[in-house]
Amino acid sequence: MEDKVLLAVAMVALIAVLSKLKSLLETKPKLNLPPGPWTLPLIGSIHHLVSSPLPYRAMRELAHKHGPLMMLWLGEVPTLVVSSPEAAQAITKTHDVTFADRHMNSTVDILTFNGNDIVFGTYGEQWRQLRKLSVLELLSVARVQSFQRIREEEVARFMRNLAASAGAGATVDLSKMISSFINDTFVRESIGSRCKHQDEYLDALHTGIRVAAELSVANLFPSSRLLQSLSTARRKAVAARDEMARILGQIIRETKEAMDWGDKASNESMISVLLRLQKEAGLPIELTDDIVMALMFDLFGAGSDTSSTTLTWCMTEMIRYPATMAKAQAEVREAFKGKTTITEDDLSRANLSYLKLVVKEALRLHCPVPLLIPRKCRETCQIMGYDIPKDTCVLVNVWAICRDSRYWEDADEFKPERFENSSLDYKGTSHEYLPFGSGRRMCPGGNLGVANMELALASLLYHFDWKLPSGQEPKDVDVWEAAGLVGRKNAGLVLHPVSRFAPVNA
Protein backbone atom coordinates (compact mmCIF):
# COMPACT_ATOMS: atom_id res chain seq x y z
CA MET A 1 0.00 0.00 0.00
CA GLU A 2 1.36 3.43 -0.79
CA ASP A 3 1.65 6.31 1.66
CA LYS A 4 -1.19 7.86 3.64
CA VAL A 5 -1.16 11.07 1.63
CA LEU A 6 -2.21 9.24 -1.51
CA LEU A 7 -4.92 7.39 0.38
CA ALA A 8 -6.27 10.69 1.68
CA VAL A 9 -6.28 12.11 -1.84
CA ALA A 10 -8.02 8.95 -2.99
CA MET A 11 -10.83 9.35 -0.49
CA VAL A 12 -11.54 12.91 -1.60
CA ALA A 13 -11.16 12.32 -5.32
CA LEU A 14 -13.19 9.14 -5.49
CA ILE A 15 -16.29 10.17 -3.58
CA ALA A 16 -17.52 11.89 -6.74
CA VAL A 17 -16.51 8.92 -8.87
CA LEU A 18 -18.35 6.43 -6.67
CA SER A 19 -21.42 8.63 -6.53
CA LYS A 20 -21.47 8.69 -10.32
CA LEU A 21 -21.03 4.93 -10.47
CA LYS A 22 -23.87 4.46 -8.01
CA SER A 23 -26.23 6.55 -10.12
CA LEU A 24 -25.26 4.63 -13.24
CA LEU A 25 -25.76 1.26 -11.58
CA GLU A 26 -29.21 2.26 -10.33
CA THR A 27 -30.38 2.64 -13.92
CA LYS A 28 -29.31 -0.87 -14.89
CA PRO A 29 -31.09 -4.17 -14.21
CA LYS A 30 -30.10 -5.64 -10.86
CA LEU A 31 -27.58 -8.45 -11.23
CA ASN A 32 -27.52 -11.64 -9.20
CA LEU A 33 -23.89 -11.33 -8.10
CA PRO A 34 -22.02 -14.07 -6.25
CA PRO A 35 -22.07 -13.65 -2.46
CA GLY A 36 -19.24 -11.93 -0.65
CA PRO A 37 -18.30 -10.31 2.65
CA TRP A 38 -19.56 -6.88 3.69
CA THR A 39 -17.76 -3.90 2.22
CA LEU A 40 -16.62 -0.47 3.37
CA PRO A 41 -16.80 2.78 1.39
CA LEU A 42 -13.88 3.31 -0.98
CA ILE A 43 -11.73 0.35 0.08
CA GLY A 44 -14.41 -2.25 -0.58
CA SER A 45 -13.37 -5.68 0.77
CA ILE A 46 -9.69 -4.99 1.42
CA HIS A 47 -10.09 -5.01 5.20
CA HIS A 48 -11.06 -8.69 5.02
CA LEU A 49 -7.65 -9.57 3.57
CA VAL A 50 -5.49 -8.10 6.34
CA SER A 51 -5.88 -11.18 8.55
CA SER A 52 -2.98 -12.75 6.62
CA PRO A 53 -0.01 -11.29 4.74
CA LEU A 54 -0.90 -13.79 2.01
CA PRO A 55 -4.20 -12.91 0.29
CA TYR A 56 -4.89 -16.44 -0.97
CA ARG A 57 -4.92 -17.76 2.60
CA ALA A 58 -7.40 -15.09 3.70
CA MET A 59 -9.47 -15.73 0.57
CA ARG A 60 -9.71 -19.43 1.39
CA GLU A 61 -11.17 -18.63 4.81
CA LEU A 62 -13.63 -16.18 3.28
CA ALA A 63 -14.64 -18.78 0.67
CA HIS A 64 -15.48 -21.24 3.45
CA LYS A 65 -18.16 -18.74 4.53
CA HIS A 66 -19.33 -17.37 1.18
CA GLY A 67 -18.81 -20.19 -1.30
CA PRO A 68 -16.59 -21.24 -4.24
CA LEU A 69 -17.66 -18.19 -6.29
CA MET A 70 -17.16 -15.10 -4.16
CA MET A 71 -17.31 -11.43 -5.12
CA LEU A 72 -14.87 -8.99 -3.55
CA TRP A 73 -14.32 -5.29 -4.22
CA LEU A 74 -10.64 -4.37 -4.18
CA GLY A 75 -11.03 -0.63 -4.13
CA GLU A 76 -13.21 0.02 -7.20
CA VAL A 77 -12.23 -3.23 -8.93
CA PRO A 78 -14.89 -6.00 -8.85
CA THR A 79 -13.02 -9.24 -8.21
CA LEU A 80 -14.37 -12.78 -8.51
CA VAL A 81 -12.53 -15.36 -6.39
CA VAL A 82 -12.81 -18.97 -7.62
CA SER A 83 -12.13 -21.62 -4.97
CA SER A 84 -13.37 -25.02 -6.18
CA PRO A 85 -12.53 -27.38 -9.07
CA GLU A 86 -16.07 -27.07 -10.44
CA ALA A 87 -15.91 -23.28 -10.48
CA ALA A 88 -12.39 -23.35 -11.95
CA GLN A 89 -13.61 -25.65 -14.74
CA ALA A 90 -16.46 -23.26 -15.51
CA ILE A 91 -14.02 -20.35 -15.85
CA THR A 92 -11.06 -22.02 -17.59
CA LYS A 93 -12.86 -24.58 -19.77
CA THR A 94 -16.62 -24.15 -20.19
CA HIS A 95 -16.44 -20.36 -20.55
CA ASP A 96 -12.75 -20.14 -21.44
CA VAL A 97 -13.20 -17.62 -24.27
CA THR A 98 -15.35 -15.35 -22.10
CA PHE A 99 -12.52 -15.22 -19.55
CA ALA A 100 -9.61 -15.31 -21.99
CA ASP A 101 -8.54 -11.71 -21.34
CA ARG A 102 -6.14 -10.64 -18.62
CA HIS A 103 -6.95 -8.11 -15.94
CA MET A 104 -4.45 -5.36 -16.68
CA ASN A 105 -3.53 -2.72 -14.15
CA SER A 106 -1.45 0.34 -14.93
CA THR A 107 1.81 -1.11 -13.62
CA VAL A 108 1.48 -4.36 -15.58
CA ASP A 109 0.72 -2.38 -18.74
CA ILE A 110 3.97 -0.47 -18.27
CA LEU A 111 6.09 -3.55 -17.56
CA THR A 112 4.78 -5.50 -20.57
CA PHE A 113 5.43 -2.66 -23.04
CA ASN A 114 1.69 -1.90 -23.32
CA GLY A 115 0.57 -5.52 -23.16
CA ASN A 116 2.74 -6.74 -26.03
CA ASP A 117 3.40 -10.09 -24.36
CA ILE A 118 1.76 -13.49 -23.91
CA VAL A 119 1.16 -13.69 -20.17
CA PHE A 120 -0.76 -10.40 -19.91
CA GLY A 121 -1.55 -9.55 -23.53
CA THR A 122 -5.14 -8.92 -24.63
CA TYR A 123 -6.81 -11.96 -26.19
CA GLY A 124 -6.91 -11.46 -29.95
CA GLU A 125 -5.05 -12.13 -33.18
CA GLN A 126 -1.68 -10.77 -32.01
CA TRP A 127 -1.88 -12.78 -28.79
CA ARG A 128 -2.79 -15.97 -30.69
CA GLN A 129 0.14 -15.53 -33.06
CA LEU A 130 2.58 -14.83 -30.23
CA ARG A 131 1.42 -17.85 -28.26
CA LYS A 132 1.70 -20.04 -31.37
CA LEU A 133 5.20 -18.71 -31.95
CA SER A 134 6.17 -19.43 -28.35
CA VAL A 135 4.77 -22.96 -28.33
CA LEU A 136 6.27 -23.96 -31.69
CA GLU A 137 9.56 -22.04 -31.65
CA LEU A 138 10.59 -21.19 -28.08
CA LEU A 139 9.10 -23.85 -25.80
CA SER A 140 8.72 -26.91 -28.01
CA VAL A 141 10.06 -30.29 -26.90
CA ALA A 142 12.85 -30.01 -29.48
CA ARG A 143 13.85 -26.54 -28.27
CA VAL A 144 13.85 -27.66 -24.63
CA GLN A 145 16.02 -30.67 -25.54
CA SER A 146 18.44 -28.39 -27.40
CA PHE A 147 19.35 -26.78 -24.08
CA GLN A 148 20.48 -30.10 -22.57
CA ARG A 149 24.18 -29.23 -22.61
CA ILE A 150 23.51 -25.92 -20.84
CA ARG A 151 21.52 -27.62 -18.09
CA GLU A 152 24.17 -30.30 -17.59
CA GLU A 153 26.98 -27.74 -17.38
CA GLU A 154 25.11 -25.55 -14.92
CA VAL A 155 24.11 -28.51 -12.72
CA ALA A 156 27.75 -29.69 -12.67
CA ARG A 157 28.88 -26.22 -11.59
CA PHE A 158 26.17 -26.13 -8.93
CA MET A 159 27.29 -29.51 -7.55
CA ARG A 160 30.96 -28.42 -7.46
CA ASN A 161 30.05 -25.33 -5.46
CA LEU A 162 28.08 -27.44 -3.01
CA ALA A 163 30.92 -29.97 -2.73
CA ALA A 164 33.32 -27.17 -1.82
CA SER A 165 31.00 -26.05 0.99
CA ALA A 166 30.55 -29.63 2.16
CA GLY A 167 34.31 -30.13 2.24
CA ALA A 168 34.66 -27.07 4.47
CA GLY A 169 31.89 -28.29 6.78
CA ALA A 170 29.89 -25.12 6.10
CA THR A 171 26.17 -24.58 6.02
CA VAL A 172 24.62 -23.22 2.83
CA ASP A 173 21.48 -21.27 2.08
CA LEU A 174 20.26 -23.80 -0.44
CA SER A 175 17.35 -21.62 -1.56
CA LYS A 176 19.75 -18.85 -2.64
CA MET A 177 22.03 -21.31 -4.41
CA ILE A 178 19.06 -22.86 -6.22
CA SER A 179 17.89 -19.41 -7.32
CA SER A 180 21.36 -18.54 -8.62
CA PHE A 181 21.62 -21.87 -10.47
CA ILE A 182 18.20 -21.51 -12.12
CA ASN A 183 18.89 -17.89 -13.07
CA ASP A 184 22.24 -18.78 -14.65
CA THR A 185 20.66 -21.66 -16.53
CA PHE A 186 17.77 -19.60 -17.80
CA VAL A 187 19.96 -16.68 -18.83
CA ARG A 188 22.07 -19.01 -20.97
CA GLU A 189 18.97 -20.63 -22.50
CA SER A 190 17.48 -17.21 -23.19
CA ILE A 191 20.40 -15.19 -24.53
CA GLY A 192 23.08 -17.82 -25.19
CA SER A 193 25.65 -16.91 -22.55
CA ARG A 194 26.03 -15.42 -19.11
CA CYS A 195 25.36 -11.71 -19.13
CA LYS A 196 27.42 -9.25 -17.12
CA HIS A 197 24.25 -7.26 -16.51
CA GLN A 198 22.03 -10.20 -15.56
CA ASP A 199 21.91 -9.28 -11.86
CA GLU A 200 20.76 -5.75 -12.70
CA TYR A 201 18.17 -7.12 -15.12
CA LEU A 202 16.84 -9.65 -12.61
CA ASP A 203 16.71 -7.01 -9.87
CA ALA A 204 14.64 -4.76 -12.15
CA LEU A 205 12.45 -7.71 -13.15
CA HIS A 206 11.73 -8.68 -9.54
CA THR A 207 11.06 -5.07 -8.61
CA GLY A 208 8.57 -4.83 -11.46
CA ILE A 209 6.81 -8.07 -10.52
CA ARG A 210 6.61 -6.99 -6.88
CA VAL A 211 5.13 -3.59 -7.78
CA ALA A 212 2.62 -5.17 -10.17
CA ALA A 213 1.34 -7.50 -7.44
CA GLU A 214 0.95 -4.78 -4.79
CA LEU A 215 -2.41 -3.37 -3.73
CA SER A 216 -1.29 0.12 -4.68
CA VAL A 217 -3.83 2.92 -4.94
CA ALA A 218 -3.12 3.17 -8.67
CA ASN A 219 -4.14 -0.46 -9.11
CA LEU A 220 -7.11 -0.21 -6.73
CA PHE A 221 -8.56 2.92 -8.34
CA PRO A 222 -7.67 2.72 -12.04
CA SER A 223 -10.30 5.28 -13.09
CA SER A 224 -8.66 8.12 -11.15
CA ARG A 225 -6.25 10.05 -13.37
CA LEU A 226 -5.11 12.01 -10.34
CA LEU A 227 -4.03 8.88 -8.49
CA GLN A 228 -2.35 7.50 -11.59
CA SER A 229 -0.29 10.67 -11.92
CA LEU A 230 0.64 10.67 -8.21
CA SER A 231 1.34 6.94 -7.98
CA THR A 232 4.78 5.89 -6.79
CA ALA A 233 3.97 2.36 -8.02
CA ARG A 234 3.75 3.63 -11.60
CA ARG A 235 7.05 5.48 -11.25
CA LYS A 236 8.72 2.33 -9.90
CA ALA A 237 7.26 0.30 -12.77
CA VAL A 238 8.54 2.81 -15.34
CA ALA A 239 12.02 2.76 -13.77
CA ALA A 240 12.08 -1.07 -13.75
CA ARG A 241 10.87 -1.29 -17.36
CA ASP A 242 13.40 1.29 -18.55
CA GLU A 243 16.25 -0.59 -16.85
CA MET A 244 15.14 -3.88 -18.40
CA ALA A 245 14.76 -2.21 -21.80
CA ARG A 246 18.24 -0.70 -21.56
CA ILE A 247 19.87 -4.06 -20.83
CA LEU A 248 17.77 -6.05 -23.30
CA GLY A 249 18.30 -3.42 -25.98
CA GLN A 250 22.05 -3.90 -25.64
CA ILE A 251 21.67 -7.70 -25.76
CA ILE A 252 19.47 -7.43 -28.87
CA ARG A 253 22.04 -5.24 -30.65
CA GLU A 254 24.92 -7.58 -29.73
CA THR A 255 22.96 -10.68 -30.77
CA LYS A 256 22.01 -9.14 -34.13
CA GLU A 257 25.66 -8.28 -34.79
CA ALA A 258 26.78 -11.82 -33.90
CA MET A 259 24.11 -13.31 -36.16
CA ASP A 260 25.17 -11.03 -39.02
CA TRP A 261 28.75 -12.27 -38.60
CA GLY A 262 27.53 -15.87 -38.82
CA ASP A 263 28.22 -16.84 -35.21
CA LYS A 264 26.45 -20.22 -34.94
CA ALA A 265 26.42 -20.13 -31.13
CA SER A 266 24.30 -16.98 -31.30
CA ASN A 267 21.56 -18.88 -33.15
CA GLU A 268 20.84 -21.31 -30.32
CA SER A 269 19.23 -19.03 -27.73
CA MET A 270 15.59 -18.02 -27.42
CA ILE A 271 16.31 -14.38 -28.16
CA SER A 272 18.16 -15.33 -31.35
CA VAL A 273 15.13 -17.36 -32.45
CA LEU A 274 12.95 -14.29 -31.98
CA LEU A 275 15.39 -12.06 -33.85
CA ARG A 276 15.63 -14.56 -36.71
CA LEU A 277 11.84 -14.61 -37.00
CA GLN A 278 11.81 -10.82 -36.81
CA LYS A 279 14.13 -10.67 -39.80
CA GLU A 280 12.23 -13.20 -41.89
CA ALA A 281 9.26 -12.11 -43.97
CA GLY A 282 5.93 -13.88 -43.75
CA LEU A 283 4.93 -13.58 -40.09
CA PRO A 284 1.27 -12.57 -39.69
CA ILE A 285 2.32 -9.88 -37.19
CA GLU A 286 5.22 -7.45 -36.95
CA LEU A 287 7.69 -8.72 -34.36
CA THR A 288 8.99 -5.39 -33.05
CA ASP A 289 11.82 -4.97 -30.55
CA ASP A 290 9.20 -3.98 -27.94
CA ILE A 291 7.42 -7.31 -28.49
CA VAL A 292 10.73 -9.18 -28.22
CA MET A 293 11.48 -7.41 -24.92
CA ALA A 294 7.96 -8.09 -23.63
CA LEU A 295 8.33 -11.80 -24.47
CA MET A 296 11.67 -11.90 -22.68
CA PHE A 297 9.97 -10.32 -19.64
CA ASP A 298 7.49 -13.23 -19.71
CA LEU A 299 10.16 -15.88 -20.16
CA PHE A 300 12.41 -14.60 -17.39
CA GLY A 301 9.56 -13.91 -14.98
CA ALA A 302 7.79 -17.23 -15.49
CA GLY A 303 10.81 -19.42 -16.17
CA SER A 304 13.29 -18.46 -13.50
CA ASP A 305 11.04 -17.69 -10.53
CA THR A 306 8.69 -20.66 -10.75
CA SER A 307 11.43 -23.25 -11.33
CA SER A 308 13.61 -22.09 -8.45
CA THR A 309 10.56 -21.82 -6.19
CA THR A 310 9.41 -25.38 -6.90
CA LEU A 311 12.90 -26.88 -6.57
CA THR A 312 13.31 -25.14 -3.21
CA TRP A 313 9.96 -26.48 -2.00
CA CYS A 314 10.90 -30.03 -3.09
CA MET A 315 14.00 -29.92 -0.89
CA THR A 316 12.18 -28.16 1.94
CA GLU A 317 9.44 -30.77 2.18
CA MET A 318 11.87 -33.69 1.96
CA ILE A 319 13.85 -32.18 4.84
CA ARG A 320 10.59 -31.97 6.80
CA TYR A 321 9.74 -35.58 5.91
CA PRO A 322 12.96 -37.62 6.31
CA ALA A 323 11.30 -40.87 5.19
CA THR A 324 10.39 -39.24 1.88
CA MET A 325 13.96 -37.97 1.49
CA ALA A 326 15.38 -41.44 2.19
CA LYS A 327 13.02 -43.08 -0.31
CA ALA A 328 13.86 -40.56 -3.05
CA GLN A 329 17.61 -40.85 -2.40
CA ALA A 330 17.46 -44.64 -2.47
CA GLU A 331 15.73 -44.58 -5.85
CA VAL A 332 18.23 -42.13 -7.36
CA ARG A 333 21.32 -43.84 -5.92
CA GLU A 334 20.22 -47.26 -7.08
CA ALA A 335 19.55 -45.95 -10.60
CA PHE A 336 22.94 -44.19 -10.95
CA LYS A 337 25.15 -46.40 -8.81
CA GLY A 338 28.85 -45.82 -9.50
CA LYS A 339 28.45 -42.65 -11.55
CA THR A 340 30.37 -39.46 -10.81
CA THR A 341 27.99 -37.28 -12.83
CA ILE A 342 24.36 -37.67 -13.86
CA THR A 343 23.32 -36.60 -17.35
CA GLU A 344 19.89 -36.02 -18.85
CA ASP A 345 20.40 -39.13 -20.98
CA ASP A 346 20.85 -41.06 -17.73
CA LEU A 347 17.60 -39.54 -16.46
CA SER A 348 15.69 -40.50 -19.59
CA ARG A 349 16.87 -44.12 -19.30
CA ALA A 350 16.12 -44.41 -15.59
CA ASN A 351 12.65 -44.93 -14.20
CA LEU A 352 12.66 -42.35 -11.41
CA SER A 353 8.97 -42.71 -10.73
CA TYR A 354 9.14 -41.61 -7.09
CA LEU A 355 11.16 -38.48 -7.91
CA LYS A 356 8.43 -37.45 -10.34
CA LEU A 357 5.84 -37.96 -7.59
CA VAL A 358 7.87 -35.66 -5.32
CA VAL A 359 7.78 -32.90 -7.95
CA LYS A 360 4.03 -33.39 -8.51
CA GLU A 361 3.33 -33.17 -4.79
CA ALA A 362 5.49 -30.07 -4.37
CA LEU A 363 3.54 -28.41 -7.19
CA ARG A 364 0.27 -29.35 -5.47
CA LEU A 365 1.16 -28.17 -1.98
CA HIS A 366 3.08 -25.10 -3.16
CA CYS A 367 1.53 -23.91 -6.42
CA PRO A 368 4.07 -21.63 -8.15
CA VAL A 369 1.48 -18.87 -8.68
CA PRO A 370 -1.14 -19.40 -5.92
CA LEU A 371 -3.83 -17.18 -7.49
CA LEU A 372 -2.75 -17.80 -11.08
CA ILE A 373 -2.45 -14.71 -13.29
CA PRO A 374 -5.69 -12.67 -13.02
CA ARG A 375 -8.21 -13.08 -15.84
CA LYS A 376 -10.90 -10.61 -16.92
CA CYS A 377 -14.49 -11.22 -17.93
CA ARG A 378 -14.92 -10.03 -21.53
CA GLU A 379 -18.72 -9.86 -21.40
CA THR A 380 -21.42 -10.26 -18.77
CA CYS A 381 -22.23 -13.95 -18.34
CA GLN A 382 -23.69 -16.49 -15.93
CA ILE A 383 -21.54 -18.91 -13.95
CA MET A 384 -23.13 -21.46 -11.62
CA GLY A 385 -26.33 -19.38 -11.48
CA TYR A 386 -24.61 -16.04 -10.76
CA ASP A 387 -24.18 -13.02 -13.00
CA ILE A 388 -20.55 -12.03 -13.62
CA PRO A 389 -20.32 -8.44 -14.92
CA LYS A 390 -18.12 -7.48 -17.84
CA ASP A 391 -14.58 -6.37 -16.84
CA THR A 392 -14.66 -8.28 -13.54
CA CYS A 393 -11.19 -9.36 -12.42
CA VAL A 394 -11.06 -13.14 -11.84
CA LEU A 395 -8.67 -14.85 -9.40
CA VAL A 396 -8.50 -18.67 -9.42
CA ASN A 397 -7.25 -19.68 -5.98
CA VAL A 398 -5.39 -22.84 -6.99
CA TRP A 399 -3.60 -22.78 -3.63
CA ALA A 400 -6.97 -23.34 -1.92
CA ILE A 401 -8.18 -25.84 -4.54
CA CYS A 402 -5.03 -27.96 -4.21
CA ARG A 403 -5.52 -28.07 -0.42
CA ASP A 404 -9.24 -28.81 -0.46
CA SER A 405 -9.86 -31.76 1.89
CA ARG A 406 -12.85 -32.85 -0.21
CA TYR A 407 -10.44 -33.85 -2.98
CA TRP A 408 -7.17 -34.46 -1.14
CA GLU A 409 -6.80 -36.72 1.87
CA ASP A 410 -4.54 -35.13 4.51
CA ALA A 411 -4.47 -32.13 2.21
CA ASP A 412 -1.88 -30.14 4.15
CA GLU A 413 0.57 -33.04 4.39
CA PHE A 414 3.38 -33.77 1.91
CA LYS A 415 2.59 -37.24 0.54
CA PRO A 416 4.03 -37.98 -2.91
CA GLU A 417 2.47 -41.45 -2.76
CA ARG A 418 -0.96 -39.91 -3.31
CA PHE A 419 -0.07 -39.62 -7.02
CA GLU A 420 0.76 -43.33 -7.44
CA ASN A 421 -1.54 -44.90 -10.04
CA SER A 422 -3.03 -41.46 -10.65
CA SER A 423 -3.75 -39.97 -14.06
CA LEU A 424 -3.35 -36.40 -12.81
CA ASP A 425 -0.78 -34.39 -14.76
CA TYR A 426 0.28 -30.80 -15.45
CA LYS A 427 -1.88 -30.40 -18.57
CA GLY A 428 -4.77 -28.63 -16.86
CA THR A 429 -7.44 -31.24 -17.61
CA SER A 430 -8.10 -32.15 -13.95
CA HIS A 431 -9.33 -29.02 -12.24
CA GLU A 432 -8.47 -30.10 -8.72
CA TYR A 433 -4.80 -29.96 -9.80
CA LEU A 434 -3.84 -26.88 -11.81
CA PRO A 435 -0.25 -25.92 -10.94
CA PHE A 436 0.24 -24.31 -14.38
CA GLY A 437 -3.36 -23.23 -14.93
CA SER A 438 -5.76 -24.46 -17.62
CA GLY A 439 -7.33 -23.48 -20.90
CA ARG A 440 -6.12 -20.87 -23.38
CA ARG A 441 -4.23 -19.00 -20.69
CA MET A 442 -2.41 -22.03 -19.33
CA CYS A 443 1.34 -21.52 -18.90
CA PRO A 444 3.01 -22.88 -22.07
CA GLY A 445 6.42 -23.26 -20.41
CA GLY A 446 5.78 -26.19 -18.08
CA ASN A 447 8.09 -28.54 -20.03
CA LEU A 448 11.03 -26.15 -19.76
CA GLY A 449 10.39 -25.47 -16.08
CA VAL A 450 10.32 -29.16 -15.16
CA ALA A 451 13.38 -29.89 -17.34
CA ASN A 452 15.35 -27.18 -15.54
CA MET A 453 14.48 -28.81 -12.20
CA GLU A 454 14.68 -32.58 -12.67
CA LEU A 455 18.41 -33.04 -13.28
CA ALA A 456 19.28 -30.66 -10.46
CA LEU A 457 16.94 -32.40 -8.02
CA ALA A 458 18.28 -35.86 -8.88
CA SER A 459 21.86 -34.58 -8.49
CA LEU A 460 21.15 -32.96 -5.11
CA LEU A 461 19.79 -36.27 -3.84
CA TYR A 462 22.51 -38.42 -5.42
CA HIS A 463 25.64 -36.52 -4.44
CA PHE A 464 24.73 -35.29 -0.95
CA ASP A 465 23.09 -36.15 2.31
CA TRP A 466 21.33 -33.19 3.92
CA LYS A 467 21.24 -32.21 7.57
CA LEU A 468 19.66 -29.36 9.47
CA PRO A 469 21.87 -27.03 11.54
CA SER A 470 22.51 -28.20 15.09
CA GLY A 471 19.50 -27.91 17.34
CA GLN A 472 16.89 -27.83 14.59
CA GLU A 473 14.28 -30.51 14.01
CA PRO A 474 12.37 -31.22 10.79
CA LYS A 475 9.18 -29.83 12.32
CA ASP A 476 10.97 -26.50 12.89
CA VAL A 477 11.49 -25.82 9.18
CA ASP A 478 9.53 -22.73 8.12
CA VAL A 479 6.96 -23.39 5.38
CA TRP A 480 5.40 -19.95 5.02
CA GLU A 481 5.41 -18.30 1.64
CA ALA A 482 6.62 -14.79 0.94
CA ALA A 483 4.08 -12.21 -0.18
CA GLY A 484 3.93 -11.67 -3.92
CA LEU A 485 2.73 -13.10 -7.20
CA VAL A 486 4.94 -16.22 -6.91
CA GLY A 487 4.69 -18.47 -3.84
CA ARG A 488 8.36 -18.36 -2.86
CA LYS A 489 9.57 -19.74 0.45
CA ASN A 490 9.71 -16.85 2.91
CA ALA A 491 12.75 -17.92 4.93
CA GLY A 492 15.98 -19.30 3.51
CA LEU A 493 16.59 -23.06 3.54
CA VAL A 494 19.84 -23.34 5.51
CA LEU A 495 21.32 -26.86 5.49
CA HIS A 496 24.56 -28.82 5.93
CA PRO A 497 25.48 -30.67 2.71
CA VAL A 498 27.42 -33.89 3.36
CA SER A 499 29.17 -35.38 0.32
CA ARG A 500 28.11 -38.93 -0.42
CA PHE A 501 29.30 -39.39 -4.01
CA ALA A 502 31.64 -36.53 -4.89
CA PRO A 503 30.82 -34.89 -8.24
CA VAL A 504 33.55 -34.96 -10.87
CA ASN A 505 36.25 -32.27 -10.44
CA ALA A 506 35.01 -31.51 -6.91
From Swiss-Prot:
Its main location: membrane. It comes from the Eukaryota. PROSITE patterns: CYTOCHROME_P450. It catalyses: dolabradiene + reduced [NADPH--hemoprotein reductase] + O2 = 15,16-epoxydolabrene + oxidized [NADPH--hemoprotein reductase] + H2O + H(+); 15,16-epoxydolabrene + reduced [NADPH--hemoprotein reductase] + O2 = 3beta-hydroxy-15,16-epoxydolabrene + oxidized [NADPH--hemoprotein reductase] + H2O + H(+). One of its GO terms (molecular function) is terpene synthase activity. Pfam families: p450. The chain crosses the membrane at residues 5-25. GO terms for biological process: defense response; diterpene phytoalexin biosynthetic process. Gene3D superfamilies: Cytochrome P450. It is found in: Membrane. It is a single-pass membrane protein. Heme binds at residue 443. Its EC number is 1.14.14.159. One of its GO terms (cellular component) is membrane. Keywords: Heme, Iron, Membrane, Metal-binding, Monooxygenase, Oxidoreductase, Plant defense, Transmembrane, Transmembrane helix. The keyword Nucleotide-binding does not apply. Its cofactor is heme. InterPro entries: Cyt_P450, Cyt_P450_CS, Cyt_P450_E_grp-I, Cyt_P450_sf. Belongs to the cytochrome P450 family. Involved in the production of antifungal dolabralexin phytoalexins in response to biotic and abiotic stresses. This is Dolabradiene monooxygenase.
